[in-house]
Amino acid sequence: ACDHCTHREVRLRSCGHRGCPRCQQHAATDWLERQRAKLLPVDYFLVTFTLPAALRRLTYRHSRDIHDLLFQIAIDTLRTFGRRHPELEADLAATAVLHTHTRKLDYHPHLHVIVPGAGIDQKNRWRTLKGRYLFNGKALARVFRARVIHGLKQAGFELPERCPSRWVVQCQHVGYGLPALKYLSRYLYRGVVAERQIVAFDPHARTVTFRYVRTRRTGGCAG
């Protein structure tokens, strides 16, 4: 309250919880600024690796181990393709973020990886991609699928009987990278439900009612 007028304003104390949409705004902004400082003057690409529905129950039960495996395999797959790319033949850098839920809060693990179209080759030379095409999404999906299944078997996991032969990996050009970083920063440090989506809360029933927007599903692989 102001001592010189009747104006009053409520300021909530910071709880510091990672699910709090207000507390994590500052952390998201800091992360974005750190990533912005690392941006190179080259074209960037956003590669999304999606785990099929048949493996989601297994992944949910063993999330720590399998999430780590997904990060490792996704990055290794991109580096393999980078070394074989005729224009690059280079080790690619990457920034990877795991998303675990849809807007409906359904468990839907997928990795977003931001990749610069440039790298250092085996002779320590800087190589830059020409154009807006990096990798074929279907080719990435085939290699990613084979490596994930092999990795799960090597780790001793029992796979479901029906595992789809076609997985989805999308690879799209995102300009100089900043739009993709801004997109990821909105989800990286915040909870899965934004404050503006909450409609009602019943403390007795311990239920929360919230709004969500249906996302557009894509059945193909970009590239």
Explain the meaning of each model-derived region:
Residues A1-G223:
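Beta->alpha loop/short-helix hinge microenvironment recognizer with preference
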